Amino acid sequence: MTIVNLAAYHFVSLDAIEQWRPLVTARCNELGLRGTILLAPEGINLFIAGPREATDAFVDYLRHDPLFEGKFATLQFKESLSDSQPFRRMLVRLKREIITMKKPAIKPELGRAPSVDARTLKAWLDRGHDDDGRPVVMLDTRNAFEVDVGTFDDALDYRIDKFSQFPEVIDANRADLEGKTVVSFCTGGIRCEKAAIHMKEIGIDHVYQLEGGILKYFEEVGGAHYHGDCFVFDYRTALNPQLQPTESVTCFACRAVVTPQAQQSPDYVPGKSCPACAQAAAAA
């Protein structure tokens, strides 16, 4: 059976999430969906999967059910397909933020930084500069272990362990960005949306966010100017530029990503350990 995988987020003020949670959970279970939906006062972030009829019904539910008062009427979804269900269960969780940055003054609902679509970005990278002749720098806003699976060529990567560290590292390294067109990016767009706003607020000029993130870029232009795969937070582990699951796996012991190359190491024992485990043990 073909499984449809949907990802979406939307920054919008929500004040009834406690009442919504059991109703949304019940609807997902009724449709046989699995995945995770985060609800917070600042919006919604979701990753769900199921048969086509079920995902279509859920999209219609979010966009049109009177319960949501039109809050999700314009919610846009990114879609990919898989041969099996990548999630084990269905969770609807309440959070303070749909992506934790610990900068409560940043409210994307009140205004976004400019965005650049995939085709325009590819044209800039092909030329080596934007439409005004400024050099383009790609800024990866993801965690270090995600970057190691794949990223844009020559992207800036500050090796953060969690997104809440992003403001601090940008404040310390803003000289890297001066005089350039900065394009922040992440998996699906949610982190780079907050990241771009922060950079604008601290006075960095010519900042853009990649519309729809890496996955939308793959969908529209493939893997141009990108090397490796894209880590995803489900049991597929990583998607290639054709949006197909790869042979990468997640280590059962330490949760590190184990690429096909790393699986050739004698330190890789399926279900038990991996090269990252061995490295951590040696450093202990």
Swiss-Prot record:
PROSITE patterns: RHODANESE_3 (PS50206). SMART domains: RHOD. It catalyses: uridine(34) in tRNA + AH2 + O2 = 5-hydroxyuridine(34) in tRNA + A + H2O. InterPro entries: Rhodanese-like_dom, Rhodanese-like_dom_sf, TrhO, TRHO_N. It comes from the Bacteria. GO terms for molecular function: oxidoreductase activity, acting on paired donors, with incorporation or reduction of molecular oxygen. Keywords: Oxidoreductase, tRNA processing. Residues 132-226 form the Rhodanese domain. Its EC number is 1.14.-.-. Catalyzes oxygen-dependent 5-hydroxyuridine (ho5U) modification at position 34 in tRNAs. HAMAP family: TrhO. NCBIfam families: PRK05320.1. PANTHER family: RHODANESE-LIKE DOMAIN-CONTAINING PROTEIN 7-RELATED, THIOSULFATE SULFURTRANSFERASE/RHODANESE-LIKE DOMAIN-CONTAINING PROTEIN 2. Belongs to the TrhO family. This is tRNA uridine(34) hydroxylase. It comes from Burkholderia vietnamiensis (strain G4 / LMG 22486) (Burkholderia cepacia (strain R1808)).
